[in-house]
Amino acid sequence: MAKKIEKSAKKKFREKVLLGVAHIQSTFNNTIVTITTNKGNVLAWSSAGACGFKGARKKTPLAAKQAAENAAQTCVSQGMREIRVNVKGAGAGREAALRGLRDAGLNITIIRDITPIPHNGCRPPKKRRI
């Protein structure tokens, strides 16, 4: 007769992080929100596409706010209170994502704009002809 093997699963230890860093990448087609610790370890992430928005609706401010709220709610449930924000990109969801973080219950301390600005580097995309 076979013996039963008892497995004892270790509980994953999650340390309480009170201060986090939110990285908001707002492109012309999507908005991605990643919340990390001060060291850079990812705690939660969300994007407009991951929230169920498809196609042209991903670039809307409503989708960006929803993505920020989803990422922030998981961190608030783990005990996070304050957050520093790094914003990158020139999309429509920049300010809406900040509102989503605030509405989820996080206290925003610093907002930094880290959009990369070329010193005449790569050639930009051609102008649209409609």
Swiss-Prot record:
<dbReference type="InterPro" id="IPR001971">
    <property type="entry name" value="Ribosomal_uS11"/>
</dbReference>
<keyword id="KW-0699">rRNA-binding</keyword>
<dbReference type="GO" id="GO:1990904">
    <property type="term" value="C:ribonucleoprotein complex"/>
</dbReference>
<protein>
    <recommendedName>
        <fullName>Small ribosomal subunit protein uS11c</fullName>
    </recommendedName>
</protein>
<dbReference type="GO" id="GO:0006412">
    <property type="term" value="P:translation"/>
</dbReference>
<dbReference type="InterPro" id="IPR036967">
    <property type="entry name" value="Ribosomal_uS11_sf"/>
</dbReference>
<keyword id="KW-0934">Plastid</keyword>
<keyword id="KW-0694">RNA-binding</keyword>
<dbReference type="InterPro" id="IPR019981">
    <property type="entry name" value="Ribosomal_uS11_bac-type"/>
</dbReference>
<keyword id="KW-0687">Ribonucleoprotein</keyword>
<dbReference type="GO" id="GO:0009507">
    <property type="term" value="C:chloroplast"/>
</dbReference>
<comment type="subunit">
    <text>Part of the 30S ribosomal subunit.</text>
</comment>
<keyword id="KW-0150">Chloroplast</keyword>
<comment type="similarity">
    <text>Belongs to the universal ribosomal protein uS11 family.</text>
</comment>
<keyword id="KW-0689">Ribosomal protein</keyword>
<dbReference type="GO" id="GO:0005840">
    <property type="term" value="C:ribosome"/>
</dbReference>
<dbReference type="GO" id="GO:0019843">
    <property type="term" value="F:rRNA binding"/>
</dbReference>
<dbReference type="Pfam" id="PF00411">
    <property type="entry name" value="Ribosomal_S11"/>
</dbReference>
<dbReference type="InterPro" id="IPR018102">
    <property type="entry name" value="Ribosomal_uS11_CS"/>
</dbReference>
<dbReference type="GO" id="GO:0003735">
    <property type="term" value="F:structural constituent of ribosome"/>
</dbReference>
